[in-house]
Design a protein with these regions (language model features):
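Short helix C-cap/helix-to-loop transition motifs enriched in small/turn-promoting residues
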Residues: 72, 85-88
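Short, glycine- and small/hydrophobic-rich beta-strand elements in well-ordered beta-sheets
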Residues: 38-59, 87-101, 155-180, 194, ...
Length: 252
């Protein structure tokens, strides 16, 4: 029996300025409460935290979720709002999507292939690059064979950057965008080079929009919140620590 498609949610939060003048002990208590709530989520659901402090001017934290139902996403956000910190967290950006196998893969296969999955499986890369995407309407009027030929070129470019893992989710009818694309890697330069090369592909001419784009750093939730609340900056987490974090909080 095929696995049910997971619902995927990207919630970018901005900490409102009044929080930053709370006494340090109050901010630390707020971080503990919020972190305990995040880490107590249902088994098997994915929830990862990323910092965007200093990398975007309009948000501080990304919470990346995957759950089996839309209701679960709603329940989680309602619980966040009930915390001490909740009233001071503004949703700066929100993208809702769903996992779905790609229609362009055909017999093209390789281990743990991203485009065939109906459930999110984060790799645990230190950096996550996220953006919503909308195609031009003319793209959907092209014959399937032309679509496929352009996507084969697209996949071939991606294969030249094996250190970058792509996670594609579909938003048709669920949110304003058509796709939400998230790339995981340990070196931003690799992603930059990949994007520059993809701009030269045939499929690129049919892109209507792929902004805003977010550069995010994977951290334990407590560290991401501490950074956002102006508390002591966390020590850099090594690759092994990041993998443990992904395994513990994503049901992996």
């Amino acid at each position: 029996m095929a696995q049910a498609r997971q619902v995927v949610k990207y919630t970018f939060l901005r900490v409102e300025a009044p929080v930053l003048i709370w006494p340090a002990e109050e901010r630390e208590a707020a971080v503990r409460e919020f972190t305990e709530l995040l880490e107590a989520g249902p088994t098997g659901e994915t929830l990862l935290a990323y910092s965007t402090v200093g990398l975007r001017g309009d948000c501080d934290v990304l919470i990346w979720q995957a759950a089996d139902t839309v209701d679960a996403i709603q329940r989680a956000e309602s619980q966040w709002r009930a915390t001490r910190l909740g009233p001071y967290l503004r949703v700066a950006h929100s993208f809702l999507a769903m996992m779905k196998p790609s229609p362009y893969l055909g017999r093209h296969r390789h281990p743990d292939q991203e485009g065939r999955r109906t459930r999110l499986k984060p790799a645990g890369g230190r950096y996550l690059f996220v953006y919503p995407m909308v195609k031009k309407r003319i793209w959907y009027r092209l014959p399937y064979d032309r679509h496929k030929a352009m996507m084969v070129e697209h996949f071939a470019i991606g294969h030249r950057y094996p250190q970058v893992k792509i996670n594609t989710a579909y938003s048709f009818g669920l949110d304003d965008q058509e796709f939400v694309v998230a790339f995981e890697c340990d070196e931003p330069a690799a992603f930059l080079d990949l994007v520059m090369e993809l701009r030269e592909s045939q499929a690129s001419r049919y892109t209507e929009r792929e902004t805003p784009i977010f550069t995010c750093v994977l951290m334990p939730p407590a560290d991401a919140l501490q950074l956002a609340l102006g508390l002591s900056a966390p020590e850099a987490v090594g690759a092994d620590g990041l993998q443990r974090q992904v395994s513990l909080i994503s049901g992996g």
